[in-house]
Amino acid sequence: MRKMKSMKVVLAALFGLSFSWNVCAQQSDIKDQGYVHKSSTSYEYPTDPAVLQKLDQWRDLKFGVLFHWGLYSVPGTFESWLLCSEEKFIPRRTKIFGDMPYDDFKKWYWGLSESFNPTKFAPEVWADIMKDAGMKYMIFTTKHHDGFCMFDTKETDFSIAKGPFKNNPLKDVTYQVFDAFRQKDFMIGAYFSKPDWHCNDYWSRDRATPTRNVNYDIKLNPDKWKRFQEYTANQINELMTRYGRVDLLWLDGGWVRAPKEDIKMDQIIDKAREYQPGLIAVDRTVPGRNENYQTPELTIPKRQLDHPWESCITLTNHWGWWKDAPYKSAAQVINILTEIVAKGGSLVLGVGPTPEGTIEEEGIQ
């Protein structure tokens, strides 16, 4: 009996040490990011039996990977957020680019599409690495807020498939990633940004862009907004019809929601499920029928939760690739995963491939 009590004390101490370590890591990541999205405060279970079945399957997987790969990978910087002129994001830009005028910075950033040429991209290697790490599902950034598409969309030429990589047989990057991971029995997720800062029907080029939001009055420009609604729906339909089985639609940019920025998400999800029955929708930070699981960012809930949830936590201190970024150790990732699973959740680990298309050796170790 004494041995049993001693063992419980040791395990409790180890878990407490692990928890303390995880909290410190989370605080460091949040400080480096400067901003994280807050989780929803309520949850609504889906009613579609096919969705419930797939959600149960997903909850059993526990460990996945979230790739952030796009224009921001070329210089190795803060994803799309340097384009945002909100006060909280300006220090990020000035720290790296000094007093470069904002309009000049935007032109420079958009111009990265002419130099993004990941000639070492080998999706089957990515899949082998993540499978060896014990991961069971994968989410890939098909489009971040900057609007640059990592798939061969018909809606815009602002795409990996239209730049220097266009003659490469792997030019439809999303297709290649999905196919490689599907062959390794991964559940497949498509990250998709609802806001699109490159699209003239979201950030109109004849107006300033002082915030992350649409920069014109929707009520005064209904035709312009309708075009954006159709643009968004068409791109999601492309992903649902041309890329094989898709299990998750992971939607970012929670400020794009009814009533202020209504893109008719209910209709989009209903249509998507006609092509992908049982599709798990993750309209993150927007509680209701289209947020089938919650996504606390760079943090772990303090207590066990009864509903489905996933902590999205970076392997380094950034979502995308940064040169010489510090990696979490294998022991640290295991501790994070252990705490999350003990609380009933899943861990999706953020990994940023290099601009050449490789996973850094330190990240593999």
Which residues does each predicted region cover?
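Bacterial Sec-dependent N-terminal signal peptides
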Residues: 1-28
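Mature catalytic domains of secreted/periplasmic carbohydrate-active enzymes
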Residues: 26-365
